[in-house]
């Protein structure tokens, strides 16, 4: 089953996450099918902390992918921000 989840990167005490579509049996930071965004929880105030390709997330969900709880929260937050800006 394909799942969209966070893959951790960055260094110690400075996390950086990629939102990836991957097989659920793969390791958290292992092989993935497609990178659909990123999340930087400790980014500076002026930088972009969250970017999600909502069209690609919709594509994967329409084809049976499931979102992890953290990714589901981030997608809701990002889509609300995008709709408010438009």
UniProtKB/Swiss-Prot annotation:
Keywords: Ribonucleoprotein, Ribosomal protein. InterPro entries: Ribosomal_bS16, Ribosomal_bS16_dom_sf. One of its GO terms (molecular function) is structural constituent of ribosome. The keyword Transport does not apply. The keyword Protein transport does not apply. One of its GO terms (cellular component) is small ribosomal subunit. Gene3D superfamilies: 3.30.1320.10. GO terms for biological process: translation. Belongs to the bacterial ribosomal protein bS16 family. This is Small ribosomal subunit protein bS16.
